[in-house]
Amino acid sequence: MARVKGGVVSRKRRKRILKLAKGYYGAKHILFRTAKEQVMNSYYYAYRDRRQKKRDFRKLWITRINAAARLNGLSYSQLMHGLKLAEIEVNRKMLADLAVNDATAFTALADAAKAKLGK
């Protein structure tokens, strides 16, 4: 029985990795071993950062809400507590959007929170 060298399979495997590494800098898109390492790292970064993105956006929203709340004489935590007492259920994404794009609506919410806090 003849020995099978597997050249077609190996070439296909290498070609697939190098195709994934297209656009990488330097040897990372040319040499198979470095390309393979970089593709593996890229998958890791993509997985990690899909989770990190959620945290980053939440941080951004909280920062924006805090800045707008302080313009209305409240801290972020006081505003959130006041909204909870007033039974106003609006998420941080929507609050941040109001703070940036519709200051009058945000001020109305801040006033409702102030009223419930007794300020």
UniProtKB/Swiss-Prot annotation:
PANTHER family: 39S RIBOSOMAL PROTEIN L20 (PTHR10986). It comes from the Bacteria. GO terms for biological process: ribosomal large subunit assembly; translation. Binds directly to 23S ribosomal RNA and is necessary for the in vitro assembly process of the 50S ribosomal subunit. It is not involved in the protein synthesizing functions of that subunit. One of its GO terms (molecular function) is structural constituent of ribosome. InterPro entries: Ribosomal_bL20, RIBOSOMAL_L20_CS, Ribosomal_protein_bL20_C. Belongs to the bacterial ribosomal protein bL20 family. It comes from Streptococcus gordonii (strain Challis / ATCC 35105 / BCRC 15272 / CH1 / DL1 / V288). It holds the Pfam family Ribosomal_L20. Keywords: Ribonucleoprotein, Ribosomal protein, RNA-binding, rRNA-binding. NCBIfam families: rplT_bact (TIGR01032). The lineage of its organism: Bacteria, Bacillati, Bacillota, Bacilli, Lactobacillales. Transmembrane segments: none annotated. One of its GO terms (cellular component) is ribosome. This is Large ribosomal subunit protein bL20.
